[in-house]
C-alpha cells in the first residue's frame, strides 16, 4: 500500500491543531496574553524607542545568543516566536510568503490580533506543506535553513510541526497556570 506522506504530515498537525490547541485558545484575554508568571519574563511590550525589535507600537524581548538559562516567557512572547521564528520565516523561505524577521515584524498588541495572525500563518503553512509531493518532501531545504540546507524538506516539516506542538503546549500550560493562580 502506498502512503501519502503529505497527507499524513498535515493530518497529524491538523488533529493536534483542531482538537488540542485551537479551541483551547478561544477566549484568550489580553490579561492572559501579557501575564508574567515570574519577574523578569520575556514578553511583547509597548515600544519605548525606535531601535527595539519589530515595527509598530509593540516590541518583543530577545537576545542573541539566548541567555543561559533562558528567561521564562509570556503567552505573548511564545505566540510572537511561533509567528516569526517558527511559521513566518519558513512560510517566507519555502512557500512564497512575505519576508519576516524579529527586527521587522509588527508584533500583535492584543490576544485577538495574535490569534488572528496565528490562524493566518497556520493556514499558510499547511497550504504550503500540502503542495509538497514525494519529490518535494525529498528535496533539500536549501540555504534558508543554514547548516541544515541539505536536509530533506520532510525533516523541516517534521521539525516545524514538533516546534508548533511544543510551543503551543507551553502556551496552553501558561493559560492553565493563569487560570489557577491564587
Where are the regions that the model predicts?
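Acidic/histidine-rich alpha-helical segments that form the ligand environment
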Residues: 105-138, 155-165
